[in-house]
Amino acid sequence: MHVKKGDKVQVITGKDKGKQGVILVAFPKENRVIVEGVNIVKKHSKPSQLNPQGGIITKEAPIHVSNVMPLDPKTGEPTRVGYKVEDGKKVRIAKKSGELLDK
């Protein structure tokens, strides 16, 4: 996957197009990510021990990884991801500026 947990990304398609957020959870096997404040859904929950009131809960749902692009650390614009080897390690770089995406 071209994005990781903690990356700042922008949604490029769908109902939340243009929104930006940080990746909270990544699911590599399903090619999906949960982005903070994006793809909010309402879930109806029955009363339980943890939530005795029950009711409607809003939370983020997973979004397909192809619908997000990482933001360039230099310009703050969405960018494609490239890879190169530095000191024997494969690192991600922003195609627009050439900046490192990995810390």
From Swiss-Prot:
Belongs to the universal ribosomal protein uL24 family. SUPFAM superfamilies: Translation proteins SH3-like domain. This is Large ribosomal subunit protein uL24. Pfam families: KOW, ribosomal_L24. GO terms for molecular function: rRNA binding; structural constituent of ribosome. One of two assembly initiator proteins, it binds directly to the 5'-end of the 23S rRNA, where it nucleates assembly of the 50S subunit. Keywords: Ribonucleoprotein, Ribosomal protein, RNA-binding, rRNA-binding. InterPro entries: KOW, Rib_uL2_dom2, Ribosomal_uL24, Ribosomal_uL24_CS, Ribosomal_uL24_KOW, Translation_prot_SH3-like_sf. Coiled coil: none annotated. One of its GO terms (biological process) is translation. Part of the 50S ribosomal subunit. Transmembrane segments: none annotated. PANTHER family: MITOCHONDRIAL RIBOSOMAL PROTEIN L24 (PTHR12903). SMART domains: KOW. The gene is rplX. NCBIfam families: rplX_bact. It comes from the Bacteria. GO terms for cellular component: ribonucleoprotein complex; ribosome.
